[in-house]
Amino acid sequence: MEIYLVTGNMNKKEEFLKMMDEELNVEFVNINLEEIQAQDIVEINEHKVKTAYNILKKQDNNKNKKRYVITDDTGLFISKLNNFPGPYIKWMQKALGSKGIADVVSRLDDNTCHAICTYSVYDGKDVHSFKGITNGKIVEPRGNNKFGWDNIFQPESLSKTFGEMTFDEKQNLSPRFKAFVQLKEFLMNEHKKYNNEF
């Protein structure tokens, strides 16, 4: 059983390794994937994971081996902008930066939002998707910006942005971690089933 996480982002890789059980060996592959244009973050990610799986399968001589391919996607959904930018956050971030996004939201009478992260895993037959959601608000940039908009996202009922938190502080709150817990449970169960077959 081989597990591949598709990412070229070193921060995501580092975070994934901190969260993953050492019992599972994960290979990281960097594949440039086209994303479909859609508002549904799960739909986008499921399309992405199938594309990645097919690319990896074509590159491998052993077509019959059991492989699990994982992709992730994240969105920031701003209430007063009818949940825009959602899955298009990386493009908004690239165009405006964190400060620009915070400036746009500061002109609204409501700065609430929610962040969603999805992991999708595909084994060539079935796609399984896992979603984590964290409610919060957009604030002026504070802290580091290691992950896109961390320095402007302040979780509900807290006074720190993700950018001001340590890894441990952020972990239980982040939508990525919430989705990851579900993904890990699924992979551990698949790993047990796979080992019982041999």
Curated annotation (Swiss-Prot):
GO terms for molecular function: dITP diphosphatase activity; ITP diphosphatase activity; metal ion binding; nucleoside triphosphate diphosphatase activity; nucleotide binding; XTP diphosphatase activity. Its cofactor is Mg(2+); Mn(2+). Signal peptide: none annotated. Its main location: cytoplasm. Belongs to the HAM1 NTPase family. It holds the Pfam family Ham1p_like. Its EC number is 3.6.1.66. It comes from the Eukaryota. The keyword Manganese applies. Pyrophosphatase that hydrolyzes non-canonical purine nucleotides such as inosine triphosphate (ITP), deoxyinosine triphosphate (dITP) or xanthosine 5'-triphosphate (XTP) to their respective monophosphate derivatives. The enzyme does not distinguish between the deoxy- and ribose forms. Probably excludes non-canonical purines from RNA and DNA precursor pools, thus preventing their incorporation into RNA and DNA and avoiding chromosomal lesions. It catalyses: ITP + H2O = IMP + diphosphate + H(+); dITP + H2O = dIMP + diphosphate + H(+); XTP + H2O = XMP + diphosphate + H(+). One of its GO terms (biological process) is deoxyribonucleoside triphosphate catabolic process. This is Inosine triphosphate pyrophosphatase. CDD domains: HAM1. It is found in: Cytoplasm. Mg(2+) binds at residue 35. InterPro entries: ITPase, ITPase-like_fam, RdgB/HAM1. Binds 1 divalent metal cation per subunit; can use either Mg(2+) or Mn(2+). Keywords: Cytoplasm, Hydrolase, Magnesium, Manganese, Metal-binding, Nucleotide metabolism, Nucleotide-binding. GO terms for cellular component: cytoplasm. ITP binds at residues 7-12, 48, 73-74, 90, 147-150, 170, 175-176. Homodimer. Gene3D superfamilies: 3.90.950.10.
